[in-house]
């Protein structure tokens, strides 16, 4: 499993909130075209924003990098922030499945 991680640190925490909505709306458009397995967007208290996207193949990750560039370029023209990115492979991940396992009888 491959990952692309974007760490953005905004000057103003309110800018990070606005940007998180923008990213959620616009990066979701790449789920199908880039065969994305998951995406998470996290907002930290002091204007930090982290976006993590998972892919099954390196070529899907590269496609996402190319296609999503315009989304990040749009934000750069609107807000002041510092951005660091890296691509990597998952070594360990755990996610509990949200499913009700009880049966209620009436």
Predicted regions and their residues:
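Short S/T/G/P-rich N-terminal loop/turn motif that feeds into the first structured element of a domain
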Residues: 1-49, 54-70, 83-106
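Outer-membrane beta-barrel domain signature
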Residues: 72-79
